[in-house]
């Protein structure tokens, strides 16, 4: 069991079903110490408005011993790697995930998908690429793993990709984990929970990690401190309220 979950959605993304309060309650039950709310970026049809992300400053940092990070799952928009988290929004979030979503960036061929993903990492704002193993978006796996290591970006193992979404992802996810291992990069684990009961569920991710013998010291979710240190190393300000997690 990992004590950190880095990818989940609330009712602010209207195809999800839980509130911030629901996630806090579930985290306490499961001994999750830190989680990031990462609702979809505003270019998605049912995503929160820009103001939602700007107003996350009203959230508490710590509730009943559970740390809360203000995040976004932004959309990769084009081959230049542009995303729908820009300007003041970049300073409003602690954690910036970005990935491909069909309503914003329709699937392309392998070369174009790879170009867009690497360009997104190269822009320097994104911390994690979400569900890079999606078979609808084939990529050059060694190339993206090497780019992720170069730009200090984590690639995600997304538990939902094995259970509910993006059917056929497993072989790609296994290959990505092995490529990140060989490149010396970071893995991030995300439940991609759309309902609080799925918070912290990483059973499929854990199986892949074991199968490829991925080193625990290169997984961001191992402890709150590891994730917070990574974000600070990437230039995010320290969060004093979470210092003791």
From Swiss-Prot:
Zn(2+) 2 binds at residues 15, 40, 194. InterPro entries: Phosphatase_YcdX_put, PHP_dom, PHP_phosphatase, Pol/His_phosphatase_N, Pol/histidinol_Pase-like. Zn(2+) 3 binds at residues 73, 101, 131. Keywords: Hydrolase, Metal-binding, Zinc. SMART domains: POLIIIAc. Pfam families: PHP. GO terms for biological process: bacterial-type flagellum-dependent swarming motility. One of its GO terms (cellular component) is cytosol. Zn(2+) 1 binds at residues 7, 9, 73, 192. CDD domains: PHP_HisPPase_Ycdx_like. Its EC number is 3.1.3.-. It is an enzyme of class 3 (hydrolase). Its cofactor is Zn(2+). SUPFAM superfamilies: PHP domain-like (SSF89550). GO terms for molecular function: phosphatase activity; phosphoric ester hydrolase activity; zinc ion binding. Binds 3 Zn(2+) ions per subunit. PANTHER family: PHOSPHATASE YCDX-RELATED. Homotrimer. Belongs to the PHP family. This is Probable phosphatase YPO2037/y2275/YP_1880. It comes from Yersinia pestis. The lineage of its organism: Bacteria, Pseudomonadati, Pseudomonadota, Gammaproteobacteria, Enterobacterales.
């Amino acid at each position: 069991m990992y004590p950190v979950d880095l990818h989940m959605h609330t009712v602010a993304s209207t195809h999800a079903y839980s509130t911030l309060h629901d996630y806090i309650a579930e985290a306490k039950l499961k001994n999750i110490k830190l989680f990031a709310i990462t609702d979809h970026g505003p270019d998605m049809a049912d995503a929160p408005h820009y103001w939602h992300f700007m107003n996350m400053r009203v959230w508490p940092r710590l509730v009943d011993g559970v740390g809360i990070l203000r995040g976004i799952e932004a959309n990769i928009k084009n081959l230049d790697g542009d995303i729908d988290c820009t300007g003041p929004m970049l300073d409003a979030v602690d954690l910036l995930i970005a990935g491909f979503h069909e309503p914003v960036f329709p699937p392309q061929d392998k070369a174009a998908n790879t170009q867009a993903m690497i360009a997104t990492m190269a822009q320097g704002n994104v911390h994690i690429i979400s569900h890079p193993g999606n078979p609808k978006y084939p990529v050059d796996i060694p190339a993206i793993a090497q780019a992720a290591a170069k730009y200090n970006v984590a690639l995600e193992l997304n538990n939902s990709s094995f259970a509910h979404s993006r059917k056929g992802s497993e072989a790609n996810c296994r290959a990505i984990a092995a490529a990140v291992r060989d490149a010396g990069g970071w893995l991030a684990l995300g439940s991609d929970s759309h309902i609080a009961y799925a918070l912290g569920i990483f059973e499929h991710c854990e199986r892949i990690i074991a199968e490829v013998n991925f080193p625990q010291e290169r997984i961001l979710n191992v402890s709150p401190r590891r994730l917070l240190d990574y974000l600070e190393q990437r230039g995010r300000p320290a969060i004093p309220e979470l210092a003791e997690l």
